[in-house]
Amino acid sequence: MQISVIIPTFNEDQNIGQLVEFILIHGQDSVAEVIVVDGNSTDSTVEVAAKARARVLHCATKSRAAQMNLGAGEATGDILYFVHADVKLVDSFVNDIKDALTSGFDAGCYRYQFDSKKSILKINAYFTRFNRIMCRGGDQTLFIKRDVFEELGRFDERFVIMEDYDFIQKIQKRYKFRIIPKSILVSDRKYHSNSWLRVQLANLTIFIMYLSGVPPQKMARYYKKLLDYR
């Protein structure tokens, strides 16, 4: 069982080196490769990732769905693990993933907590333990058997945002999905330039739009109007 870790990036030179090094150290012989798929960064993300011994791919489109699909297409492992660049994984991620898959699950994620002591963000994090689609998200990372990923048709590249919700919904309709009862650490940077209430209202609005079948490009445009974020 070999794991290919796929990390989509855009201007992540402050995070990517440490993350790649952590994965390679704790992945040992079970991580086949760390693939960083860059979406035209204007900082030194590519150079930092390469120096940390990641395999770097260049995606013409700045879109996590397109970037992750490109990485998956180049991956050699039989397990794909999609990770955002601004998270900190648990040391036991390899064993956790293997245990879940050998126990009959086909895909899964972690709970998370924020790298902040704010009580209100702890409330957000608490809900990631529940098996409800609105409690999911790419920040929780996603592992999946490669054959299941291909059978489901990969990420829908029409979605510039909400690609993770869309794909996890597809998984849960046909396969067993595991939420590992451990928490990874997620950056609270989205809240630095937006209030907690503003982020929650934006997320709720976009989620309702998604469930209502609003076209992906319209959701993306509206989300950019709602939040000041990257």
Write out the residue ranges for each language-model feature.
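Hydrophobic helical membrane-anchoring modules
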Residues: 172-230
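A conserved acidic beta->alpha catalytic loop
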Residues: 38-46, 87
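Glycine-rich, basic loop-to-helix element that forms the pyrophosphate-binding segment
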Residues: 59-75
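Conserved donor NDP-sugar-binding/catalytic core segment of glycosyltransferases
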Residues: 92-119
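Short, acidic, metal-binding catalytic loop of nucleotide-sugar glycosyltransferases
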Residues: 21-31
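Acidic helix N-cap motif at the loop->helix transition within catalytic regions
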Residues: 14-18, 43-52
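Short aromatic/hydrophobic "clamp" motif used to bind/position activated sugar donors
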Residues: 80
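Cell-envelope/extracellular polymer assembly enzymes that use nucleotide-activated donors
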Residues: 2-4, 33, 166
